[in-house]
């Protein structure tokens, strides 16, 4: 779990639940800084992930965001199943055919993810290689709603 909050109790609660927490000391550098920190942690933990040509089933990373509270476990499971059963190198939950979060990237795309800068996330890589993206259209669009500020809750 990548930790990017000013509230230490969130980190403490996540660790109490068994999450491995990685602190992002520079969230102002944008989405790419968080993605890279998380991915580098995976590579550090699983050295075989450095072999970007490793099999897609054994070398993939699932990215989720914390501000989608209505996402269902069933949707995440369906996304993983879709990725596993497809021949694609990426999979993403979609709204109206547009890829979003959560999303999965095979190791083949790690170099491009690690090269991202600023407030640019994995969507840039997905859009570049749309033919290699399996899209899971989520029927309940509320699941994919980002809740960045309190008015978003209603």
Name these PLM-found stretches.
Residues 100-111, 150:
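Conserved nucleotide-sugar donor-binding
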Residues 1-66, 70-99, 129-140:
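Nucleotide and nucleotide-moiety/phosphate-recognizing core
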Residues 99-100, 121:
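A conserved catalytic-core signature of glycosyltransferases
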Residues 63, 104, 146:
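Conserved beta-strand segments that form the floor/walls of ligand-binding pockets within enzyme
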Residues 111, 115-154:
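Conserved alpha/beta core of the MobA/IspD/sugar-nucleotide pyrophosphorylase nucleotidyltransferase superfamily
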Residues 3, 93, 102, 114, ...:
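Glycine- and other small-residue-rich loops at beta-strand/loop junctions that grip anionic moieties
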């Amino acid at each position: 779990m990548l930790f990017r909050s000013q509230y230490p109790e969130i980190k403490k609660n996540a660790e109490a639940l068994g999450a491995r927490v990685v602190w992002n000391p520079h969230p102002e550098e944008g989405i790419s800084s968080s993605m890279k920190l998380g991915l580098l942690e995976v590579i550090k933990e699983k050295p075989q992930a450095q072999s970007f040509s490793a099999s897609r089933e054994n070398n993939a990373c699932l990215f989720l965001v914390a501000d989608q509270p209505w996402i269902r476990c069933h949707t995440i499971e369906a996304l993983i199943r879709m990725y596993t059963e497809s021949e694609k190198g990426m999979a993403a939950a979609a709204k109206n055919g547009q890829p979003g979060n959560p999303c999965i990237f095979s190791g083949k795309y790690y170099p491009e993810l690690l090269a991202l800068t600023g407030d640019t996330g994995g969507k840039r890589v997905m859009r570049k290689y749309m033919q290699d993206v399996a899209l899971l259209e989520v029927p309940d669009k509320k699941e994919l709603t980002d809740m960045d500020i309190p008015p978003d809750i209603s």
